[in-house]
């Protein structure tokens, strides 16, 4: 990996954002366990359901471990819109304008600062970077998010990075996946540890269409059930002050 001067490392450490974590997100309940796993292993598999907070919180956990100082924390997303929105969310949680501590690079858009710590990008962008930087010197940590989607880009990256890791013992890899594929990724990376995180659950109300409605009356039935729903939603927002 490219060696940074002591002066640059000192400056980056001094400017390292201090993340704040919400206990409302299930992934943060396992934060200490995740930190230990990252410290002790080169590869960690995070198995998290939708709503667990893994996408936005894992990069912050890496910051807490002072990752991102020697190189960037590279965080891939399958789609451009996801890379941009996740970057904006993490930047907001770190109270940093987008493009400074946290930036993104997608096709036709590059908002990365030389002083940044977290870089969101599509998996295609990272794959393209391997052509000019085969050892991925720019990164000290890589997060492959939504790996269970198994696109060609993701599969190529997973295979490439496995070959790269012995040449970059300083590089950490975190793979996030749905439940069904976590053990498969673990086996691929020589039985890397798997940490399972539950999703956040929300209450669900079931509203039924009125009984005995003929097809000709369907439009009226939709209105009958929609109006109470609109009233319910408005009252809920007003009671929450929103």
Regions found by a protein language model. Name each.
Residues 1-242:
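P-loop NTPase motor module signature
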